[in-house]
Design a protein with these regions (language model features):
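Short, low-complexity N-terminal intrinsically disordered segments enriched in polar/charged residues
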Residues: 1-25, 29, 33-37
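Carbohydrate-active catalytic/glycan-binding domains of CAZyme proteins
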Residues: 89, 114-115
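Extracellular loop and loop/strand-boundary signature of outer-membrane beta-barrel proteins
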Residues: 110-111
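Beta-strand elements of well-folded, non-transmembrane domains
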Residues: 101-105, 126-128
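Extended, composition-driven regions rather than compact fold-specific motifs
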Residues: 42-44, 84, 116, 120, ...
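A solvent-exposed, acidic/Ser-Thr-rich amphipathic alpha-helical stretch
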Residues: 28-102
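Short beta-strand edge/turn micro-motifs at domain boundaries
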Residues: 92-96, 117-154
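Short, glycine/acidic-rich beta->alpha junctions
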Residues: 11, 77, 117-118
């Protein structure tokens, strides 16, 4: 792997960490900064949003559901494992990983927790844009395990 490829790979690994940190620590307030204007956000077989406005709507809907929970708070932590990065061009890449989400209503520490809220296979198509930043063109999450508290199902209307 040449130096440019190593650099791009590290930048994409940092993108993964920064993205999930935005969700876990900032309530997804700036999440659309991680997406291209022409993005797609796909969750499962029947949920597909287009553009930054669609992504923003999803996270705004999520915030409305959180506001109805205990203390109006939901603690989340997203963990990415088994990361694979395939550079498909100088400015394009496919990123695959397993995302393990822990989530619970109320202030930390969440008590009586039994396990992950969701485990998903995640696929990102990424593009480095003119400003040099990598962004998501496509976010596709395929849930493999869903915990007993189906919060995300409520957000998705399921």
């Amino acid at each position: 792997m040449d130096l440019e490829s190593v650099s791009a790979t590290l930048e994409l690994q940092q993108l993964i960490s920064d993205y999930w940190h935005e969700l876990d620590s900032n309530g997804a307030r700036n999440v659309t900064d991680y997406y291209t204007e022409d993005c797609s956000f796909v969750a499962g077989a029947s949920f597909n949003l287009k553009g930054r406005a669609g992504v923003r709507k999803f996270y705004d809907d999520r915030a409305r559901h959180v506001a109805t929970e205990k203390d109006g708070i939901r603690i989340t932590r997203h963990l990415a494992a088994n990361v694979r990065i395939n550079l498909t061009g100088k400015n394009s890449a496919i990123v695959e990983f397993v995302m393990v989400n822990y989530s619970g209503a109320g202030a930390a520490p969440v008590k009586d927790f039994t396990g992950p809220s969701m485990v998903s296979d995640v696929y990102w198509d990424c593009r480095r844009e003119a400003d040099g930043k990598w962004r998501l063109v496509t976010f596709r999450g395929e849930p493999q395990f869903i915990g007993g508290e189906n919060f995300i199902g409520k957000v998705l209307g399921k």
